[in-house]
Amino acid sequence: MAVYDVGDLDLAKKYGIVDVDADDRITDFVEKPEQPPTMLCATATYLYTREDAARVETYLAEGNPPDQPGNFVAWLHTRAPMYAYRFPGEWYDIGDAAQLLEADNRMRRRRGLPERAEYSPS
Protein backbone atom coordinates (compact mmCIF):
# COMPACT_ATOMS: atom_id res chain seq x y z
CA MET A 1 0.00 0.00 0.00
CA ALA A 2 1.31 3.43 -0.88
CA VAL A 3 1.15 5.86 2.03
CA TYR A 4 1.89 9.53 2.47
CA ASP A 5 2.77 11.37 5.67
CA VAL A 6 0.24 14.22 5.76
CA GLY A 7 2.24 15.87 8.57
CA ASP A 8 -0.79 16.96 10.62
CA LEU A 9 -2.91 14.89 13.01
CA ASP A 10 -6.03 16.99 12.37
CA LEU A 11 -5.67 16.46 8.63
CA ALA A 12 -5.07 12.74 9.22
CA LYS A 13 -8.64 12.45 10.57
CA LYS A 14 -9.92 12.80 7.00
CA TYR A 15 -8.17 9.69 5.68
CA GLY A 16 -7.56 6.02 6.16
CA ILE A 17 -4.51 5.89 8.44
CA VAL A 18 -1.97 3.10 8.78
CA ASP A 19 0.47 2.23 11.51
CA VAL A 20 3.59 0.26 10.63
CA ASP A 21 6.41 -1.57 12.38
CA ALA A 22 10.15 -0.99 11.88
CA ASP A 23 10.02 -2.93 8.57
CA ASP A 24 7.02 -0.89 7.32
CA ARG A 25 4.73 -3.89 7.75
CA ILE A 26 1.22 -2.61 8.31
CA THR A 27 0.12 -3.30 11.87
CA ASP A 28 -3.09 -1.27 11.89
CA PHE A 29 -5.45 0.40 9.44
CA VAL A 30 -8.21 2.74 10.60
CA GLU A 31 -10.59 4.60 8.31
CA LYS A 32 -10.97 8.29 9.27
CA PRO A 33 -10.05 7.88 12.95
CA GLU A 34 -11.13 10.41 15.57
CA GLN A 35 -7.64 10.08 17.11
CA PRO A 36 -5.15 9.04 14.42
CA PRO A 37 -2.31 6.82 15.69
CA THR A 38 0.00 8.17 12.95
CA MET A 39 -0.05 10.64 10.08
CA LEU A 40 0.53 7.96 7.41
CA CYS A 41 -2.38 8.31 5.01
CA ALA A 42 -3.48 5.49 2.71
CA THR A 43 -3.44 6.88 -0.83
CA ALA A 44 -5.74 4.25 -2.37
CA THR A 45 -2.80 2.83 -4.31
CA TYR A 46 -2.50 -0.90 -3.69
CA LEU A 47 -0.45 -3.74 -5.10
CA TYR A 48 -1.87 -7.17 -4.32
CA THR A 49 -0.37 -10.62 -4.75
CA ARG A 50 -2.40 -13.30 -6.52
CA GLU A 51 -3.05 -14.83 -3.12
CA ASP A 52 -4.36 -11.51 -1.81
CA ALA A 53 -6.63 -11.09 -4.83
CA ALA A 54 -8.00 -14.60 -4.29
CA ARG A 55 -8.98 -13.58 -0.75
CA VAL A 56 -11.54 -11.11 -2.14
CA GLU A 57 -14.05 -13.98 -2.50
CA THR A 58 -13.60 -14.92 1.17
CA TYR A 59 -13.90 -11.28 2.20
CA LEU A 60 -17.19 -10.90 0.31
CA ALA A 61 -18.53 -14.31 1.43
CA GLU A 62 -18.12 -13.15 5.03
CA GLY A 63 -20.58 -10.34 4.29
CA ASN A 64 -18.07 -7.51 4.19
CA PRO A 65 -18.88 -4.37 2.16
CA PRO A 66 -17.95 -4.63 -1.53
CA ASP A 67 -17.17 -0.92 -1.98
CA GLN A 68 -14.42 1.28 -0.52
CA PRO A 69 -11.12 -0.57 -0.99
CA GLY A 70 -9.97 0.49 2.48
CA ASN A 71 -12.41 -1.97 4.03
CA PHE A 72 -10.71 -4.85 2.24
CA VAL A 73 -7.27 -3.60 3.34
CA ALA A 74 -8.40 -3.33 6.97
CA TRP A 75 -9.57 -6.94 6.77
CA LEU A 76 -6.60 -8.26 4.76
CA HIS A 77 -3.76 -6.87 6.87
CA THR A 78 -4.91 -9.08 9.76
CA ARG A 79 -4.68 -12.19 7.57
CA ALA A 80 -1.62 -11.63 5.38
CA PRO A 81 1.51 -9.49 5.57
CA MET A 82 1.02 -6.08 3.98
CA TYR A 83 3.68 -3.42 3.69
CA ALA A 84 3.64 0.34 3.27
CA TYR A 85 5.57 2.22 0.63
CA ARG A 86 6.10 5.83 1.69
CA PHE A 87 5.57 8.18 -1.23
CA PRO A 88 8.30 10.83 -1.35
CA GLY A 89 7.54 14.33 -2.56
CA GLU A 90 4.03 15.61 -3.02
CA TRP A 91 0.69 13.83 -3.01
CA TYR A 92 -2.69 15.33 -3.77
CA ASP A 93 -6.04 14.10 -2.56
CA ILE A 94 -8.38 14.60 -5.52
CA GLY A 95 -11.46 13.08 -3.91
CA ASP A 96 -13.77 15.91 -4.91
CA ALA A 97 -13.98 18.58 -7.62
CA ALA A 98 -12.54 21.36 -5.43
CA GLN A 99 -9.47 19.27 -4.51
CA LEU A 100 -8.98 18.27 -8.14
CA LEU A 101 -9.18 21.91 -9.22
CA GLU A 102 -6.64 22.92 -6.57
CA ALA A 103 -4.19 20.18 -7.65
CA ASP A 104 -4.70 20.98 -11.32
CA ASN A 105 -4.08 24.70 -10.77
CA ARG A 106 -0.93 23.98 -8.79
CA MET A 107 0.44 21.96 -11.70
CA ARG A 108 -0.67 24.61 -14.20
CA ARG A 109 1.16 27.35 -12.25
CA ARG A 110 4.34 25.27 -12.34
CA ARG A 111 4.09 25.05 -16.10
CA GLY A 112 3.28 28.73 -16.58
CA LEU A 113 -0.28 28.00 -17.67
CA PRO A 114 -3.31 30.06 -16.64
CA GLU A 115 -5.35 28.76 -13.72
CA ARG A 116 -8.85 27.42 -14.22
CA ALA A 117 -11.88 28.90 -12.43
CA GLU A 118 -13.56 25.51 -12.47
CA TYR A 119 -12.45 22.04 -13.41
CA SER A 120 -13.06 20.82 -16.91
CA PRO A 121 -10.80 18.05 -18.23
CA SER A 122 -10.71 19.53 -21.74
Question: Language model features by range: what are they?
Answer:
Residues 10, 22-121:
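Catalytic-core segments of class I nucleotidyltransferases/pyrophosphorylases
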